[in-house]
Amino acid sequence: MNNMNIQISSHFVKELRSKTGAGMMDCKKALQAADGDMVVAAETLRKKGLVSADKKSTRLALEGVIDSYIHTGSRIGVLIELNCETDFVARRIEFQQLARDLAMQIAACQNIFYVSINNIPQNIIDREIRIESAKEDIFNKSPEMKDQIVKGRVGTRLKEMSLMNQPFIKDQNISIEDLVKQHIALLGENIKVRRFQRFLLGETLDMI
């Protein structure tokens, strides 16, 4: 049986969140994986470095680094601004390695254009909806089914554009969002990907 299909009461999710400070979805996933065992779920969150990470995510992050990555052959380059709360953490090797890993991720995944889905402009979302709605394979579907298919496909496309939704290239079992949360818990400060820019040799300006 797939543990992720287990129904977990919102009461237990809120209780685990209260005890650990982890995000609601992280708590729900941990409880599902632990078959509802609160102690096991809390330990899972602790091992993943997610305990208290959510509590730190609202604090201002104004320090940090601007890092760069140039891929082999010098045909792809990335600049990224990664923020934290203090210069002390900005100098930590773990923080600097995170910046480098994120830059490598952006270089490797050329469909990424935004930090998160929340950063995607509405005109881009509307364009994706129009593209999916015009596809021939859904012409004969009922309006309800068509809307459902379009919503699913657009959701998938938006995740492909978002850095935070990508599986980490060094560990496909975690997302970039999870990776950042782990470093928030490890370093004890809020961490934010502020912005990034990818450069492709010979690229046009109108990428998307």
UniProtKB/Swiss-Prot annotation:
InterPro entries reported in the protein's UniProt record: EF-Ts_dimer_sf, Transl_elong_EFTs/EF1B, Transl_elong_EFTs/EF1B_dimer, Transl_elong_Ts_CS, UBA-like_sf
Plastid is among the record's keywords: yes
Domain of life: Eukaryota
GO molecular function: translation elongation factor activity
Gene Ontology CC entries for this record: chloroplast; mitochondrion
Tagged with keyword Lipid metabolism: no
Keywords: Chloroplast, Elongation factor, Plastid, Protein biosynthesis
Pfam families, per the entry: EF_TS
Homology family: Belongs to the EF-Ts family.
Listed NCBIfam families: tsf
PANTHER family with a match to the protein in the record: ELONGATION FACTOR TS, POLYPROTEIN OF EF-TS, CHLOROPLASTIC
Role this protein plays: Associates with the EF-Tu.GDP complex and induces the exchange of GDP to GTP. It remains bound to the aminoacyl-tRNA.EF-Tu.GTP complex up to the GTP hydrolysis stage on the ribosome.
The protein's name: Elongation factor Ts, chloroplastic
UniProt gene name: tsf
